[in-house]
Each structure stands twice: as structure tokens, then as C-alpha cells.
Amino acid sequence: MTRLTLALDVMGGDFGPSVTVPAALQALNSNSQLTLLLVGNPDTITPLLAKADFEQRSRLQIIPAQSVIASNARPSQAIRASRGSSMRVALELVKEGRAQACVSAGNTGALMGLAKLLLKPLEGIERPALVTVLPHQQKGKTVVLDLGANVDCDSTMLVQFAIMGSVLAEEVVGIPNPRVALLNIGEEEVKGLDSIRDASAVLKTISSVNYIGYLEANELLTGKTDVLVCDGFTGNVTLKTMEGVVRMFLSLLKSQGEGKKRSWWLLLLKRWLQKSLTRRFSHLNPDQYNGACLLGLRGTVIKSHGAANQRAFAVAIEQAVQAVQRQVPQRIAARLKSVYPAGFELLEDERGKKPNHR
């Protein structure tokens, strides 16, 4: 394994360095070839490195930043005032070649805008998309995008997302000839927004994409598709709803019946069932798949949940490692060159259409 360097915006997220710095040390323990650039306020970061040993410190470097982009800042305002911020400095390290990827739990809109400004989209890509890999009930994984980078998407963008998601499923997840579906309100051809139906028509003509049609939200975790494509608004709401339900379910398993008097054999049975069910469904815990890749850029950027704990942020760092090792941007660029003439030009006359649904 070759050595690689990641830039971490350790000031971003709900908990900032109190979570991101310990997560960085955890990641260093798990990967001996990893070097981390911790971008933020040195006075805040340094005390949190007190437990780091000599070997860990040799693979750490603090990069000073003057400010932090607030999580509630408007993206346009945040970008204008971003110079010297931990997020921007981390992205600039990638642009300059000092780091191979950036990980941030900060403001999503600002991260999207700055990444597009500094790293530039791949040729043939209008806007990047946030993508994650979710576990499903068949013990496999489903690639889902967009998760919030683009609230409104036209048909061209949906087709681009489908191609990028297909490459990610094949090259990173390891699914040969991955099935691709569009998220819709029904499986019938006449259902949904014009943008979805127009994208569907084009995807049917692209031989390198194994397009299977529409999928409804209640089938997200069934394993019926390997790649699920949607606009950012729908994807974000869908993902957060699913995560909320899963967290509630797992917490109920732990707390069910607490405080009530039971006979000893009922208590043993309850504990056995709780452990068994928790093991069975623990793979659905959102902490285990934290980290959405901003796909479609000339560099690698991973967006962590703002509310991520130490374990979850460490997972996001590992996502960045995998994306760099699998050369995701380069592989997407190669695939785009092969399909561009067959797909994207067919959508030129679709631009400017107003959304309509049935």
C-alpha cells in the first residue's frame, strides 16, 4: 500500500475538534500508511493531541486556519468570506497537491461551492453530487446519489449522476455490471417529473449503463438496485428519514422493557433477543457508513455528517482513503469520455424545461 495524505477540516461539524481530532488519531492507528493534515486553530487542536504517541505525531501536521465557516451560513456568503477558513484551506491543500483528499463535516452548501470553485468539475459534468453507499437487506450495498448537493436537478444532471454512480458501484463497491434505477413516485413510465422521465429515456440508450427503470422509496433497502439516482432534495430527505427510523429502532432494542420487574428467565430471554436483534441490524447503524463523497470533481472530497461522533468521522476518513486508492475521479473521467457522444448530446434540447409531474 502506498502512502497517502488527507487534509481534514477539523473545525467543521457540530462538535469540531473534540470529535475530529480523536477520530484522526483513531484513523492513524488503523492505517500505518496514512498521513493527516489537521486544518484549524492550533491552540484548540494541540491539547487534543496529548495522548498521541511519537509514531502518530510523525504522521500528523497542524495547518493553521484563521476562521471557521458556520454551519448556518448561507453558501454564497460563506464562499465570499471563505479565505483563511479551515474548509477552504483544506480544499486548497488538495488543489495544490499537498493532500490527495479533503474530509469535512462543515456546511454542505459551502463545501459544494468551494470544491467546485477550487477543484473544478470533470469534463462533461455540470455539478458534483453527494453519494453514499448504504447496506441493504440482501447483505449487499446500494450506491445512492444525490444526497443534497443539488436541490433541483434537470435530466442531464440525473444522467450524469447515473453514470458516476455506476462507476463507483463497479470500481469501489466491486459490483460487476451494476443495476441503475431512478427514484420515482411509481414504477409506471408515465409517473414523475419531466426531468426523471427524460433522463429515463436517455439512460435506455446508453449501453454502458445497466438501467432497470424506476424504484420507489420503500424499496431503498431491498437490494433491487445497485445504484439509485435522485435529485438532492429528495435524496437528502429520504436518507435522513431512513437514518432516523434506524436510530429509533436500535435505541428501542436497547431500552425495551427497562425498569419493569420480570422473572429471571424472562429477563434472560429479553437480553438474548436484544443482543441477537442488535447484531442482526447493527449494519444499518448510520455511523457505520458515514461519509458522502462529492462525486464529479477533479479531486476527492468527503462530506461527513455534521453531527458525526468520533467513530463516524473515522469512517468518513476511511471513505476518503478508499476513494483515493480506487482512483474514483480518474475512472469516472474515463467512463464519461466513452459515453458522452451517446448520451449527453441527446439532452441538449431538454435544458430549460420547467419541471412537471403526473
From Swiss-Prot:
Oligomeric and partner information: Homodimer. Probably interacts with PlsY.
Catalytic activity: a fatty acyl-[ACP] + phosphate = an acyl phosphate + holo-[ACP]
PANTHER family: FATTY ACID/PHOSPHOLIPID SYNTHESIS PROTEIN PLSX, PHOSPHATE ACYLTRANSFERASE
E.C. no: 2.3.1.274
Record function comment: Catalyzes the reversible formation of acyl-phosphate (acyl-PO(4)) from acyl-[acyl-carrier-protein] (acyl-ACP). This enzyme utilizes acyl-ACP as fatty acyl donor, but not acyl-CoA.
Parts forming coiled coils: none
Location(s) in or outside the cell: Cytoplasm
Organism, as annotated: Escherichia fergusonii (strain ATCC 35469 / DSM 13698 / CCUG 18766 / IAM 14443 / JCM 21226 / LMG 7866 / NBRC 102419 / NCTC 12128 / CDC 0568-73)
Protein name per Swiss-Prot or TrEMBL: Phosphate acyltransferase
GO terms under cellular component: cytoplasm
SUPFAM superfamilies registered for this protein in UniProt: Isocitrate/Isopropylmalate dehydrogenase-like
Gene: plsX
GO molecular function, one term: phosphate:acyl-[acyl carrier protein] acyltransferase activity
InterPro entries: FA_synthesis (IPR003664), Phospholipid_synth_PlsX-like (IPR012281)
Keywords for this protein: Cytoplasm, Lipid biosynthesis, Lipid metabolism, Phospholipid biosynthesis, Phospholipid metabolism, Transferase
Pfam families on file: FA_synthesis
Cystines in this chain: none
